[in-house]
From Swiss-Prot:
The gene is Wdr62. It comes from Mus musculus (Mouse). InterPro entries: Quinoprotein_ADH-like_sf, WD40/YVTN_repeat-like_dom_sf, WD40_MABP1-WDR62_1st, WD40_MABP1-WDR62_2nd, WD40_rpt, WDR62, WDR62-MABP1_CC. GO terms for biological process: cerebral cortex development; mitotic spindle organization; neuronal stem cell population maintenance. WD repeats lie at residues 109-150, 153-194, 196-234, 291-330, 357-396, 411-450, 490-529, 532-574, 578-618, 626-665, 671-713, 714-752, 803-846. This is WD repeat-containing protein 62.
Length: 1523
């Protein structure tokens, strides 16, 4: 493609264009790839020399302002001598010459926004007032643009200012909380008179003879008199004398405008109220007459000698005669809201009225007595200047339409030399919270195809997103508030980010709600709209055209990245979830090799490289940089070699895009406050512009870090910056709704062009080499070999420069390896290295493999490094446990022999391979299935041939990952869930062919860190077990569901977006701290995730609540579907309703070797229990079909009180992940793997609560344990193993804290349920004593941490309104929280012991311990209490005469639950066994009796585990021998 990417610059195109312009010949296209970048320190001849402070300030000048922040008539004024109009725009006063359409600018010396201004009667001076604490009243010379005087006399802001007609005095009125009214002698800089006003003052006006002035406001019209005699005698400040106007029956009105009469009406005063009343006061301050304007609201007033103009709502300006208040006419209305300015080519279009159109309200008026022009400012931030000499033929002199709310982003349209351009050269685009995208062009000689419209000389086109016009008017203009008060705003409105495609044909935009839209730029039609994210889209980026593939990446506050293929109608290629917080920037890099770089508020930078797989392009992480500061933005230079990152500590860090190493770090802001929010590199790669939260903009030399220029002017933080392609302008946008166009000085422009020519000279002298993939797979990062680098002046190079020239070749010429045996290496986990580590590596920068070979004997110790390989034991993960995170497996050129050496990489794959190789069927055959990628069909096309929606193609996993799916996944889906699931799993087996080179995703617990004493090899071995048994069958929903861990209730994915917050008014007036913090909330507080925004951990940590299993999230965005799949498949298996759970006695043990076939899923992980461990069971497949049929017949029943005692796990997952604040790359590497970024196994982490001591009397915890735990805790003597391979377990040195032991251990089953109760003691089998002694009981202080919420007892009857639990259930929950509530224990009858004794499957027959009896008594007591509470609740519902829908639903669910319990008891013969068993009888130690809690009764399952162990031992031995 020959287009320029909007987010980056094509160097060859820019060089050729600039070269041809300088040579005076037409430019031509060159398709050659750009050469490598010169080293960062080479550019010395073109660097600007250090300059004094004044020179730095003047190197960049403000050329044009597109925006206005005037909120009332106090922000608009007119020069009575020349007719120039002055208005406020942030911290700048814009003086406009309407005739010539030229602007002059006066900058406020401080960074406080301006609130009011007024011209002097002679037009030489302007007085301004400020916002903020201790504001200053300043006098400016209009011609010189310098400050003449400043006066400090207010505390909280200035509402309005005015010159006296004789120019002796200036009057300033403070805000309501300031309450100070000052009369200044501005030439002497003293306060002549002062007084306090208790009410809010909105406007003031001087009389023509300067003897008095009038202030109006809330129920306030007051005349203030200046006595010249008293003033001459008194040198100090005197009280200001005021008299109230006599309002009569209008005393309750709010007056918003005032003007003293002129000419023959000089003795009269005119006021207008919000309610639409025009009032006239005579010389005696008496209300003489008033007129109803017949409008819903009026806001401003302006008078001339003969006319009175009243600004009202809906664009109405009424005109009256001054001497008689006779109504004359109305001014023509401005444009209607939503007008297509591109169609307004004829002047008659302005006077065309559209039916039911809405017009913007008038908010400010000023009159030019010289030209008889009336200037009007409307509520949508538009300005019109009308010629009112003849009120019968009013004409428009000048107009402009600006953004009315925060401007979030700016993009410059690419330049083309042919006719492919959709927009004229020099066009730039801006997007705003007013839900518009605006196209601007300041070139008067632009393309004739785009004619100038009658509305604006610079605005070409306005795209109204979804035709929304409700946000076009500034919400800060309300009649019941002053300009100093904030207004809650719709935080979800507006376009947040946009990007132009490289070919200039498409415009991608993301809004505040997470929607992604694609517009085509020929006709501005919306092609695609998709709900992509659950929170606002923060960044968009198209890939570079040199790479040969066109991708679009979108990143959001929901911390997900979606990669779309533009060439496939924006089909979804991959979803990445590496980041643990909001993603602030994403960029594509590389020329032929596609690279993706992203940074976020989690202080991490991820470097990824693309790999071509059979099902599409996938990105694999190659480098991860963890900084100690938040990263807000980044940009890539023209050479695609360096990426500049804006950091919270006000530094700019420059990294190499290939190696991920930091090359430079320098200050990005000259101040000592705030954070860097934006960074942008110019088209030549010479300078970069930065914006700081202190509202400043800096221009910095990219190579030296020296500040070239710094600018101020915006009243809010700068949200976007772009250089133009001609290297002459810098465009900045801000939260003050203004767009500033800065003109770069000639020395800066010359320097940029010179650098482009130097790069062009380099390109002509070197021969680019072909870039190819390496043949065999390497354990290092894949990258292309660059061409030779030639420096500009080798004689002047320093040692760092020479090192930088040699570094790419050293990094990219990694030798290939035939074996998977990795080099010994240090895991660098904590920032910069100490000296010993640098000596170990041999160099500070270059860390190639040779350094490790030379230092094999040195073994460092400390928290900065740990051995990645330990002797003598080697595990099967040695070859890939570390390198797979950073080594992309290139699909092309991989031979079958290579694949054989790489795959399989986990025990499940090893099992399947061995089975095929031996020619017989193993017990584990059929347990592993490939992940299917269902297609939702091709996108539908509209009548223009474009897709009307974004099709979700197959999930972006690394081709087809290995995964086990349990048939119960289908059982757990009801209603729409099952239909949606079946639709997603329609893909045929052809999708899984040819993709066997990819790895298996593993799942581990990520809520706690692993024990410090566990070795690296052991951790890797545990990870191998986790990866293997993530593919284990789970066909026993009953006992497994009793082990579900208690979880804190997380909000649904609908709530995973940024909450609405009260914000700043859309003007530039942040008069309260809440307003000043609004924009910073979107940048500096990206890391402060609220409770509704759970993006602190991995996707597996985001669990679905009990009440959301059977309801869809109403927002079906890509992120929602991605999260939904991960929630239902990554950590916890789908839970069955209570009435579908089968007791252990009722579950037949599978016989024979046939195991249920795994069903397909769309996630890359196996089913795990809630505590992160797998569960092995042996239920027959027929039970799955039976449960499925039950599911079709019975409504879903929630988890009732009968299961609350068994719902707890070893530890409740933490609600805040440790990854939120850590900067350790090693720690973040071990978090969950992205569904679309399979990077290898993750080190399993054991929850720390496993080591907590047992608390007697607490709840029984059902966790997986090994048979080795059946020995007594006191003597720790291991019991003989009844299954598995003894040699394997002995050689693996598995400890009690290993995760793999939990994965292989049989899950305990739920205790038997009985209906017989008494208070007599009962004996418990010793096997249960051992099991209970091995369990960990949680603390009884706060059961809410274990998930005992009200939503666990009663179902949610609808997706929106949960059923409130009755008092009985709330009482039960309250009792469970009280530690003393378990003091009086109810005990079952002795007959109950027979149920336990006679039930099959005890491990041992030892005498029960007293601790066990106490635990069992506690469980039985809670069971009795829960059953009694449920029974009482059911009786109460049955006895009630009037039941609502929720109560009827609760009654039905309770009845269904009771019926299910009864059926289970009858099926398991528990009641008969309880009647026949002798009381107080212990079971005989009969070796033939099978234990109830042992699920290994199936010989097939036992044989499978033994075979697993044997295969593992063989793999370890083979690996140790180096096979």
């Amino acid at each position: 493609m020959a287009a320029l990417a909007a987010g980056g610059y094509t160097r060859s195109d820019t060089i050729e264009k600039l070269s041809s312009v300088m040579a005076g010949v037409p430019a031509r296209r060159n398709q050659s790839s750009p050469p490598p970048a010169p080293p960062l320190c080479l550019r010395r001849r073109t660097r600007l020399a250090a300059a004094p402070e004044d020179t730095v300030q003047n190197r960049v000048t403000l050329e044009k302002v597109l925006g206005i922040t005037a909120q009332n008539s106090s922000g608009l004024t007119c020069d009575p001598g020349t007719g120039h109009v002055a208005y406020l725009a942030g911290c700048v006063v814009v003086v406009l010459n309407p005739k010539e359409n030229k602007q002059q600018h006066i900058f406020n010396t401080t960074r406080k926004s301006l609130s009011a201004l007024a011209f002097s009667p002679d037009g030489k001076y302007i007085v301004t007032g400020e916002n903020g604490h201790r504001p200053t009243v300043r006098i400016w010379d209009v011609e010189e643009k310098t400050q003449v005087a400043e006066m400090l006399g207010h505390k909280y802001g200035v509402a309005c200012v005015a010159f006296s007609p004789n120019m002796k005095h200036i009057v300033s009125m403070g805000y309501q909380h300031d309450m100070v009214l000052n009369v200044w002698d501005w030439k002497k800089d003293i306060v002549v008179a002062s007084n306090k006003v208790s009410c809010r003052v909105i406007a003031l006006s001087f009389s023509e003879d300067s003897s008095y002035f009038v202030t109006v406001g809330n129920r306030h019209v007051r005349f203030w008199f200046l006595e010249a005699s008293t003033e001459a005698k008194v040198t100090s400040t005197v009280p200001l004398v005021g008299r109230s106007g006599i309002l009569g029956e209008l005393h309750n009105n709010i007056f918003c405008g005032v003007a003293c009469g002129r000419g023959r009406m000089a003795g009269n005063t005119f006021c207008v109220s919000y309610s639409g009343l025009l009032c006239q006061f005579n010389e005696k301050r008496v209300l003489d007459k008033w007129i109803n304007l017949k409008v819903s609201l009026s806001s401003c007033l302006c008078v001339s000698d003969e006319l009175i103009f009243c600004g009202c709502t809906d664009g109405i300006v009424r005109i009256f005669q001054a001497h008689s208040l006779l109504y004359l006419t109305n001014l023509p209305k401005p444009h209607y809201l939503g007008v297509d300015v591109a169609h307004g080519l004829d002047s008659s279009f302005l006077f065309h009225r559209k039916a039911e159109a809405v017009y913007p309200d008038t908010v400010a008026l000023t009159f030019d007595p010289v030209h008889q022009w009336l200037s009007c400012v409307y509520k949508d931030h538009s300005i019109y200047i009308w010629d009112v000499k003849d009120i019968d033929e009013v004409s428009k002199i000048w107009s402009e339409l600006f953004h009315s709310s925060f401007v979030w982003n700016v993009e410059v349209y690419p330049e083309f030399e042919d006719q492919r351009a959709c927009l004229p050269s020099g066009t730039f685009l801006t997007c705003s919270s007013d839900n518009t995208i605006r196209f601007w062009n300041l070139d008067s000689a632009s393309d004739t195809r785009w004619q100038k419209n009658i509305f604006s000389d610079s605005l070409l086109k306005v795209v109204y997103v979804e035709n929304d016009i409700q946000h076009l008017q500034d919400l800060s203009h309300f009649p019941d508030r002053g300009s100093e008060n904030g207004t809650p705003m719709d935080m979800k409105a507006g376009v947040r980010v946009m990007q132009v495609s490289p070919d200039g044909q498409h415009l991608a935009s993301g809004d505040r709600s997470g929607n992604l839209r694609i517009h085509e730029l020929h006709f501005m039609d919306e092609l695609i709209k998709v709900e992509a994210h659950d929170a606002e889209v923060l960044c968009l980026e198209y890939s570079k055209p040199e790479t040969g593939v066109t991708l679009l990446a979108s990143a959001s506050r929901d911390r997900l990245i979606h990669v779309l293929n533009v060439e496939k109608n924006y089909n979804l290629e991959q979803t990445l979830d590496d980041h643990s917080s909001s993603i602030t920037a994403i960029k594509f890099a590389g020329t032929r090799d596609v690279q993706m770089i992203s940074c976020g508020a989690d202080k991490s930078i991820y470097f990824r490289s693309a790999q071509q797989a059979s099902d599409g392009l996938h990105f694999v992480r190659t480098h991860h940089v963890a900084e100690k500061t938040t990263l807000y933005d980044m940009d890539i230079d023209i050479t695609q070699k360096y990426v500049a990152v804006a950091c919270q500590d006000r530094n700019v860090r420059v990294y190499n895009t290939v190696s991920g190493k930091q090359k430079k770090c320098y200050k990005g802001s000259q101040g000592d406050e705030g954070s860097l929010l934006k960074v942008h590199v110019d088209p030549s790669g010479t300078f970069l512009a930065t914006s700081c939260s202190d509202k400043s903009i800096s221009l910095i030399d990219f190579y030296s870090g020296e500040c070239v220029a710094k600018m101020f002017g915006h009243s809010e933080i700068v949200t976007g910056m772009k250089f133009t392609y001609d290297c002459r302008h810098l465009i900045t946008v801000s939260g003050d709704s203004c767009v500033f166009i800065w003109h770069l000085g000639p020395e800066i422009t010359t320097c940029m062009k010179q650098h482009l020519l130097e790069i062009n000279h380099q390109e002509q002298q070197q021969q680019p080499k072909d870039q190819k993939w390496s043949g065999p797979p390497s354990q290092e990062t894949y990258a292309s070999t660059p061409s030779e680098i030639r420096s500009l002046s080798p004689g002047e190079q320093t040692e760092d420069e020479m090192e930088e020239e040699c570094e790419p070749e050293e990094l990219l010429k990694t030798p290939s390896k035939d074996s998977l045996d990795p080099d010994p290496r240090c895991l660098l986990t904590n920032g910069k290295l100490p000296l010993w580590a640098k000596r170990l590596l041999g160099d500070d920068d270059v860390a190639d493999s040779s350094a490790f070979h030379a230092k094999r004997s040195y073994q460092p110790h400390g928290r900065w490094a740990e051995r990645a390989e330990q002797e003598p034991l080697k595990t099967i993960l040695d070859a890939w446990s570390l390198d797979s995170y950073f080594t992309p497996m290139k699909p092309e050129n991989l031979q079958d022999s290579v694949l054989d050496s790489v795959e399989p990489q986990n025990l499940a794959g090893l099992l399947s391979e061995c089975s095929l190789g031996n020619g017989h069927t193993s017990p584990g055959e059929g347990l592993v299935s490939y992940l299917l990628h269902p297609e939702l069909g091709s996108p539908k096309e509209d009548n223009r041939g474009h897709p009307s929606y974004l099709p979700l193609q197959r999930e972006a996993t690394e081709a087809s990952e290995l995964i086990l799916c349990s048939p119960e996944a289908e059982v757990s889906l009801t209603g729409m869930h099952r239909e949606y699931y079946e639709e997603e799993t329609e893909a045929g087996p052809e999708d899984q062919q040819g993709d066997t080179y990819l790895r298996v995703s593993s799942v581990s617990s990520k809520d706690q860190s692993p024990p410090e004493d566990s070795g690296e090899s052991e951790a890797e071995l545990e990870c191998s077990f986790a990866a293997a048994h993530s593919s284990a069958p789970q066909t026993d929903p009953g006992p497994h569901l009793t082990m579900t861990a208690g979880k804190p209730e997380y909000p649904s994915t609908e709530e995973l977006s940024q909450p609405e917050l009260p914000g700043l008014g859309n003007g530039s007036l942040p008069q309260t701290p809440e307003q000043e913090k609004f924009l910073r909330h979107h940048f500096e507080t990206l890391t402060d995730a609220p409770t509704e925004e759970l993006f602190h951990g991995s996707l597996g940590d985001i669990k679905i609540s009990e009440t959301e299993d059977y309801f869809f999230n109403p927002r079906l965005s890509i992120s929602t579907q991605f999260l939904s799949r991960l929630q239902k498949t990554s950590r916890c298996p789908p839970r069955l309703p209570l009435h579908l759970m089968k007791s252990p006695e009722a579950q037949p043990v599978g016989q024979g070797g046939n195991q249920p076939k795994a069903g397909p899923l769309r996630a890359g992980t196996g089913y795990m229990s809630s505590d992160g461990t797998n569960v092995l069971s042996g239920q027959k497949a027929e039970e799955t079909q039976e449960a499925l049929s039950l599911l079709d017949r019975k409504p879903p029943t929630p988890t009732s009180v009968l299961t609350t005692g068994r719902e707890q796990s070893i530890s409740a997952p933490s609600s805040c992940s440790y990854l939120e604040s850590t900067t350790s790359s090693h720690a973040k590497t071990t978090r969950s793997i992205s569904l679309g970024d399979s990077e290898g196994p993750v080190t399993a982490e054991l929850p720390q609560s496993l080591h907590k001591p047992l608390s007697p009397g607490q709840e029984l915890q059902a966790i997986p344990t090994t048979v080795a735990l059946t020995s007594s805790i006191k003597d720790h003597e291991p019991a003989p193993l009844s299954w598995g391979n003894h040699e394997a377990r002995a050689s693996l040195k598995l400890t009690l804290s290993s995760v793999c032991e939990q994965l292989l251990s049989p899950p305990p089953q739920e205790p038997p349920i009985t209906h017989v109760w008494s208070q007599e003691p009962v004996d418990v089998p010793p096997s249960m004593a051992v099991t209970v002694a091995s369990f960990c009981a949680p603390s009884p202080v706060d059961m809410s941490t274990l998930g005992l919420h009200s939503s666990m007892f009663l179902p949610k009857t609808s997706a929106s309104g949960p059923l409130t639990p009755p008092a009985h259930l709330q009482l039960l929950e309250t009792r469970s929280r009280v530690p003393g509530s378990t003091a009086a224990l109810l005990e079952p009858t002795p007959d109950a012991s027979g149920v336990i004794a006679d039930s099959p499957g005890h491990w041992d027959t030892e005498v029960p311990t007293p601790e066990l009896l106490g635990s069992v008594e506690s469980v039985l007591h809670r069971l009795q209490t829960a059953f009694q509470e449920a029974l009482d609740l059911y009786r109460m519902l049955v006895s009630s005469s009037q039941l609502g829908p929720e109560q009827q639903q609760a009654q039905t669910e309770l009845a269904s639950t009771f019926h299910w319990i009864l059926n289970q008891l009858e099926a398991s013969n528990c009641m008969a066994a309880a009647n026949l068993a002798p009381p107080q009888t212990l079971p005989s130690p009969d070796p033939l009796s099978l234990p109830t809690l042992c699920p290994l009764a199936s010989p097939n399952l036992q044989a499978l585990l033994e075979h697993y162990s044997e295969l593992l031992v063989q793999a370890v031995r083979r690996k140790a021998r180096g096979d």
